[in-house]
């Protein structure tokens, strides 16, 4: 056991800056998730409508996605440590304001929308600045492990925040959760005071003003489009996140179509454990330093997990599928991040990563919006006992409530599996691992040769 976690211990021991940064920001992230969970409970308890809750979630996600390209351009212009610190401080002040409004009995529903919007903006700055700062703090050969640790924090937050929030909101109420979140921000900012985040060389072609920022965004896109393997990867990850957006909406009604709420909670706890284990695995393994191929291996496994989860209305079968899918998720995300962070010059990473996040974020949003029309409007009626597919597909995956959703998960899984397998063999034909080549010309020449 000690031998297996030795790489993580060595990484954290050698890289003091990254360790302090990771600890402070991880604590801050958990605090943010506590507040998000607590506010969602407050909104629902005070409105008793899903619509108002959906609006709050909308203001939490979409604004951040839409402004991300501009955030990336600004991140490349400023000190990344300062951006993380200022966004932490801004988010802390938003949380403190909410706590003050709640304590004085002045908190209104529209306050939560505004706070969700502003927190989303702060989160965009934090996410892009942290992604761009990580390669500056960690040697190239350790970036995979560092990304694994960052995803470990996310997984722990997703697993523990609902449980902790459910306990704490009874003891200290929502205002207590908000003050705990504020404290985690303070700790996060405090740790930043003791670390150094190296700044890359400035971009000599930088212009000023609004048009300068737009020009920076265009330049970031040119850095992506000039490398065919990055364009292919961007397209693949957009499809993957579209499927993720579908699954995120469908997993709840799929399980509840034949199981209890308690069973649903148990399966999702298993999913959280899978994410934690996947993050630990990635932190120990560190990923392949010279190959894009492991990304497609684990995404193919992710597709297999989705097929298993959708194939039968069985708790053990769905549990296995969910476990496989969520175990591979942090490995896929960490590997994807590592590819981008090692393939793009440090001084343009803010712009490039922000464009990646914008496109994939839109993929998630489209997946969220498409889930209901595809499942309820098309596939669920087809897999009723007298539906169009009852005597064909229904013989395999069964018919009735939730089977249209299950069939959609099977389709998603087969889609991801087939694309992953195709790209695996496509890149394998190159005859050379291309992740950290340091030369786009070599990669492009090899791809062009194959296509001819």
Residue spans for each PLM region:
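Pair of pore-lining "gating" transmembrane helices in MFS-fold secondary transporters
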Residues: 9-41, 117, 222-246, 323
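Transmembrane alpha-helical cores of Major Facilitator Superfamily
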Residues: 26, 58-62, 89, 148-152, ...
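C-terminal transmembrane bundle of multi-pass solute transporters/carriers
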Residues: 54-56, 66-70, 77, 83, ...
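Juxtamembrane intracellular "pre-TM" segments in multi-pass secondary transporters
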Residues: 2-18, 198-235, 443-447, 451-452
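Cytoplasmic helix-loop-helix junction between adjacent transmembrane helices
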Residues: 115-158, 162
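Helix-loop junctions on the cytosolic side of multi-pass membrane transporters
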Residues: 105, 132, 136-137, 178-209, ...
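Glycine/proline-centered helix-kink
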Residues: 37, 155-166, 279, 364-372
């Amino acid at each position: 056991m000690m031998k297996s976690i030795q790489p993580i211990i060595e990484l954290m021991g050698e890289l003091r800056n990254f360790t302090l940064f990771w600890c402070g920001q991880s604590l801050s992230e958990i605090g943010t998730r506590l507040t998000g969970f607590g506010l969602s409970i407050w909104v629902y308890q005070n409105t008793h409508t899903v619509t108002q809750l959906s609006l709050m979630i909308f203001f939490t996600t979409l604004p951040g996605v839409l402004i991300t390209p501009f955030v990336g351009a600004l991140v490349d212009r400023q000190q990344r440590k300062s951006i993380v610190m200022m966004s932490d401080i801004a988010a802390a002040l938003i949380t403190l304001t909410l706590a003050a409004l709640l304590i004085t009995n002045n908190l209104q529903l529209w306050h939560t929308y505004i706070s969700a919007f502003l927190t989303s903006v702060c989160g965009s700055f934090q996410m892009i600045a942290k992604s761009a700062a990580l390669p500056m703090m960690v040697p190239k050969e350790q970036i995979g492990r560092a990304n694994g640790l960052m995803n470990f924090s996310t997984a722990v937050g997703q697993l523990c925040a609902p449980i902790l929030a459910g306990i704490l909101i009874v003891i200290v109420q929502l205002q207590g959760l908000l003050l705990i979140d504020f404290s985690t921000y303070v700790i996060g900012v405090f740790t930043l005071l003791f670390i150094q985040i190296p700044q890359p060389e400035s971009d000599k072609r930088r212009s000023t003003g609004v048009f300068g920022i737009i020009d920076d965004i265009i330049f970031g896109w040119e850095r992506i489009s000039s490398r065919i393997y990055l364009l292919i990867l961007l397209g693949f990850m957009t499809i993957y996140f579209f499927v993720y957006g579908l699954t995120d909406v469908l997993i709840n009604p799929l399980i509840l179509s034949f199981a209890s709420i308690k069973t649903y909670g148990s399966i999702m706890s298993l999913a959280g454990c899978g994410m934690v284990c996947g993050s630990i695995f990635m932190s120990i393994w560190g990923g392949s330093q010279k190959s894009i191929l492991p990304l497609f291996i684990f995404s193919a496994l992710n597709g297999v997990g989705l097929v298993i989860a959708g194939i039968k209305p069985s708790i053990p079968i769905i549990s296995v599928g969910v476990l496989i899918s969520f175990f591979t998720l942090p490995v896929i995300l960490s590997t994807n991040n590592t590819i981008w962070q090692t393939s793009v010059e440090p001084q343009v990473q803010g712009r490039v990563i922000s464009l990646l996040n914008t496109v994939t974020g839109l993929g998630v949003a489209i997946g969220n919006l498409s889930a209901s029309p595809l499942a309820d409007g098309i596939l669920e009626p087809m897999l009723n006992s007298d539906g169009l597919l009852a005597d064909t597909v229904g013989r395999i995956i069964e018919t009735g409530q939730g089977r249209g959703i299950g069939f959609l998960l099977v389709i998603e899984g087969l889609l991801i599996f087939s694309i992953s397998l195709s790209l695996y063999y496509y890149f394998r034909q190159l005859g050379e691992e291309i992740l950290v080549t340091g030369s786009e010309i070599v990669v492009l020449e090899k791809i062009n040769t194959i296509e001819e």
